[in-house]
């Protein structure tokens, strides 16, 4: 992805979904396809605020590959790319 002109807020994370490769040449209707649960972190917010008003930094960073909950976040389209904005708490694991 080239330059991002989106400013992600608070503890939100911008994810570019990574589709799994299909094998066997079977074409499924879009309604039958499994929603991706793997993606790349494109941008992160500054973090939420704790009870003292201090920022709590996020664990993930741009460039991390992650697994996330299947129905997490809100899908958006920006510069003809499908992206998902979700809370960091919807991320299940960072792929090392």
Curated annotation (Swiss-Prot):
SMART domains: Cpn10. The keyword Lipoprotein does not apply. GO terms for molecular function: ATP binding; metal ion binding; protein folding chaperone; protein-folding chaperone binding; unfolded protein binding. Its main location: cytoplasm. Heptamer of 7 subunits arranged in a ring. Interacts with the chaperonin GroEL. PANTHER family: 10 KDA HEAT SHOCK PROTEIN (PTHR10772), 20 KDA CHAPERONIN, CHLOROPLASTIC (PTHR10772:SF63). This is Co-chaperonin GroES. It comes from Wolbachia pipientis wMel. The lineage of its organism: Bacteria, Pseudomonadati, Pseudomonadota, Alphaproteobacteria, Rickettsiales.
């Amino acid at each position: 992805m080239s330059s991002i002109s989106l400013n992600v807020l608070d503890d939100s994370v911008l994810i570019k979904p990574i589709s799994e490769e299909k094998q066997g040449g079977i074409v499924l209707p879009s309604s039958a396809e499994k929603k991706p649960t793997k993606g790349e972190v494109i941008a992160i917010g500054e973090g939420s605020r704790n009870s003292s008003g201090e920022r709590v930094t996020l664990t993930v960073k741009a460039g991390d590959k992650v697994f996330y909950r299947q129905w997490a976040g809100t899908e958006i389209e920006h510069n003809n790319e499908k992206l998902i904005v979700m809370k960091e708490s919807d991320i299940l694991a960072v792929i090392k």
